[in-house]
């Protein structure tokens, strides 16, 4: 899941 920092989960 791409979220704002801090990244929670995998960055795709």
Curated annotation (Swiss-Prot):
Modified residues (Phenylalanine amide): 12
UniProt main location, coarse: secreted
The keyword Secreted appears for this protein: yes
Alphabetic keyword roster: Amidation, Neuropeptide, Secreted
Presence of the UniProt keyword Secreted in the record: yes
Source domain of life: Eukaryota
A GO CC term assigned to this protein in UniProt: extracellular region
GO biological process, alphabetically ordered: neuropeptide signaling pathway
Compartment list: Secreted
Family: Belongs to the FARP (FMRFamide related peptide) family.
Name of protein: SIFamide related peptide
Organism of origin: Rhodnius prolixus (Triatomid bug)
């Amino acid at each position: 899941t791409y979220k704002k920092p801090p990244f929670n989960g995998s960055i795709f």
